[in-house]
Amino acid sequence: MGQLVSFFQEIPNIIQEAINIALIAVSLIAILKGLVNLWKSGLFQLLVFLILAGRSCSFKIGRSTELQNITINMLKVFEDHPISCTVNKTLYYIRESENATWCVEIAALDMSVLLSPHDPRVMGNLSNCVHPDIKHRSELLGLLEWILRALKYDFLNYPPLLCEKVTSSVNETRIQINVSDSAGSHDFKETMLQRLAILFGTKLMFDKTPKQFIVIRNQTWVNQCKSNHVNTLHLMMANAGHAVKLRRLQGVFTWTITDAAGNDMPGGYCLERWMLVTSDLKCFGNTALAKCNLNHDSEFCDMLKLFEFNKKAIESLNDNTKNKVNLLTHSINALISDNLLMKNRLKELLDTPYCNYTKFWYVNHTITGEHSLPRCWMVKNNSYLNESEFRNDWILESDHLLSEMLNKEYFDRQGKTPITLVDICFWSTLFFTTTLFLHLVGFPTHRHIQGEPCPLPHKLNSNGGCRCGRYPELKKPTTWHRKH
């Protein structure tokens, strides 16, 4: 008997599914039959003939297409910035600007060109390394500092630099970096070579070779290599500075719709009248809890949050430590609620409505039984506000409740018989009816000379000649045909 009752209860769902299947079948059949009718009407053949057959006497495809390219060179945009290039990925050059007649060369060598006892060490100030008689001394000094800053060279922790001793006979600036493992840490060489690769945007050719020294010196620019704007961007990004990391305040507590053991609670919360609701026992389902999860801006959500925290804190510990747990729970509750209580206390002092977390109001739909998320009934002068004083709030809440009900009804109906499916069925049926009429009328597809075979792929004019000019005009009568 129970199975029979269950069967009769499922009959509406079975009928609804059958209607959906019927709508899908009708839509597919109408679309397929419509396409067949269009093909049989000759419309596709006529369009293909008009597009292809009259262009030329052959079927040449792609005669108006060609491969083209564009090269982007933004050196004019960065002409006042340092520009770099490379020669065989072993020598690197940096110019101060696009119009500079000098440059700085960076090379890796397997032998030292400067000696520590003879040449001075650099502890941070590069001005003693540049000869005072060198032209563009200030620009060269700035470019050297730019390079070392891009390499993130630490004068305090890295091996000291060696620079050419400034004399009256030497008018060249040379700086040497010892990248051997004996000079610094075991990975100092790999670190510096990797930074060079990042700086110049390429893989260094000497990263696996026994090169032990990096030498930086000034040179005259004689077009050693070709520059591009990508290398300039690498230099600019290497000297862009350090990004400031900001901290964003995250949520302190999170909670889900489960009990203390981690099991789902499909029934939601039932709050007793001594807890929140003063009239009687009221149950709030998962919808209210989901709203609190998405938008935590209600005093009711604050109470649910405290209630959930207390319950989990108490039920997850042993009964032998209940006193300590109670003390801990009260302390945490005080910390959590300090902000809320202080906010309401300030409102009370300012003689503005505040919440005492005792009485809550919500909008209830008497027919469906659905209700809105409870909101705090504000207190002013030690008495609850009259309903007329927050009339706009509960009217707006009722509008939101009706909107949610309409949306829910719409999605429920979409789950049974989607409106889109009905629209597809309607338009596919209309498409089939239109194509059926076109099939009955028919379209001519090409022109024939009376009594002659099919001239395809050539397109004839009214005088019987080939429109592309390959064949002379025969001045014979022509007629339109539907089939070949």
Curated annotation (Swiss-Prot):
Protein name, per record: Pre-glycoprotein polyprotein GP complex
Disulfide bond sites: C85-C225, C270-C283, C292-C301, C355-C376
Residues binding Zn(2+) 2: H446, H448, C454, H484
Site, Important for GP-C-mediated membrane fusion: residue positions: K33
Gene this protein is translated from: GPC
All ranges on the Extracellular side of the membrane: 2-17, 59-423
Transmembrane region(s): 18-33, 424-444
GO cellular component: host cell endoplasmic reticulum membrane; host cell Golgi membrane; host cell plasma membrane; membrane; viral envelope; virion membrane
Biological process terms in GO annotation: fusion of virus membrane with host endosome membrane; receptor-mediated endocytosis of virus by host cell; virion attachment to host cell
